[in-house]
Amino acid sequence: MVNRLKEKYDNEIVPSLMEKFNYTSIMQAPKVDKIVINMGVGDAVSNAKRLDEAVDELTLIAGQKPVITKAKKSIAGFRLREGMAIGAKVTLRGQRMYEFLDKLVSVSLPRVRDFHGVSKRAFDGRGNYTLGIREQLIFPEIDFDDVNKVRGMDIVIVTTANTDEESRELLTQLGMPFAK
């Protein structure tokens, strides 16, 4: 079964982008390549159970088991040793990526308190968009009663676009609610 957002991309967004940016081939049209969700768990240094909770929550949110990230350097001020587990990340591609993006845009972001749209300035100059979320409770899979600690996460949407303008147009047409 083809995802609703993937179908919209193929049938409506690609022709629209080709017309707007004067592409000669449909392969020039930018597309979402992958979505990386990263959750840093700073208190995993003192309490290893916190990391397991974060992994479980990220598994529920992404529908895929995350990879545990380890510290690259030792930092004495944070009581951190090189190689200690300090977070979790998951990379979504294909069907799961479109399902997550659809859920993020249509269900999760509207549940954010005092939400007026996401920043237009969070592009990196190469067509990738980074979004910070302050609490994992905006996702429908997370049960409020089971959460011990509110954690944020970073969501990076990697596109094949060459410029920020192309990427912004792609994400706008996919339904990303940018601030006015």
Curated annotation (Swiss-Prot):
A GO cellular-component term linked to this record: ribosome
Record keywords: Ribonucleoprotein, Ribosomal protein, RNA-binding, rRNA-binding, tRNA-binding
Domain of life, per lineage: Bacteria
GO MF annotations, alphabetized: rRNA binding; structural constituent of ribosome; tRNA binding
GO biological process, one term: translation
Pfam families in the cross-refs: Ribosomal_L5 (PF00281), Ribosomal_L5_C (PF00673)
Subunit composition and interactions: Part of the 50S ribosomal subunit; part of the 5S rRNA/L5/L18/L25 subcomplex. Contacts the 5S rRNA and the P site tRNA. Forms a bridge to the 30S subunit in the 70S ribosome.
Family under the similarity heading: Belongs to the universal ribosomal protein uL5 family.
Function: This is one of the proteins that bind and probably mediate the attachment of the 5S RNA into the large ribosomal subunit, where it forms part of the central protuberance. In the 70S ribosome it contacts protein S13 of the 30S subunit (bridge B1b), connecting the 2 subunits; this bridge is implicated in subunit movement. Contacts the P site tRNA; the 5S rRNA and some of its associated proteins might help stabilize positioning of ribosome-bound tRNAs.
Name under which the protein is recorded: Large ribosomal subunit protein uL5
Species, as recorded: Ligilactobacillus salivarius (strain UCC118)
Gene that this sequence comes from: rplE
